[in-house]
Amino acid sequence: MTPAQEDEVLARIAEGLVYTESEAASQNSERRTEQIFDYNHTPPREEGRRRSLLVDILGSVGERTVLLPPFHAAFGSNVHIGDDFFGNVNLTFVDDVDIRMGHGVMIAPSETLTTTGHPVHPARRVDFARFSEPIVIEDKVWIGSNVVVLPGVRIGYGSVIGAGSVVCRDIPSMTVALGTPCRVVREITDEDLTTRLAGR
């Protein structure tokens, strides 16, 4: 593939248009597969090495971040996390394009954040054809266990996503949302300063 052809593919990817596995092959050098393997096998006592590996793997890493192994990523280099981030075990980033998380984000076990989907018609899925759209998770979002966040979603400031949800559309700030598909069930208000659970 010529440089001009690579630029054309990257432009299509950036626009959320369909592209194939063969067309995406030029991006393989950006994958952090070996470093992710090393991170997932780092002893808990080696916090400094774990931090160093995470800085090498991800596109950007804030201060006071915790990402418990194992985690998985298509690239790693397209993931950006802010300060005071906490990610629990079995977090999967399908980061064919950017996944950006703000400050104070908390993510429970067994999440999938996927920027990539595939065409519905089988004739369009030749050569693993797909499309990719970035995910944005704003500051102070809390995502419950076993949630799937789909391509192009933005979750607004301070919101809570209930366990087991499939988030396929944007969620506004300061709301509680849950379900499959994920829907807003209520706003977060000052009354929640004196309660413990989202449903009470």
Feature-to-residue mapping (PLM):
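Flexible, glycine/small-residue-enriched loop-and-beta-strand segment within the central core
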Residues: P44, F71-R154, T180-A198
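Conserved metal-binding segment of the jelly-roll/cupin
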Residues: I161-G164, D170
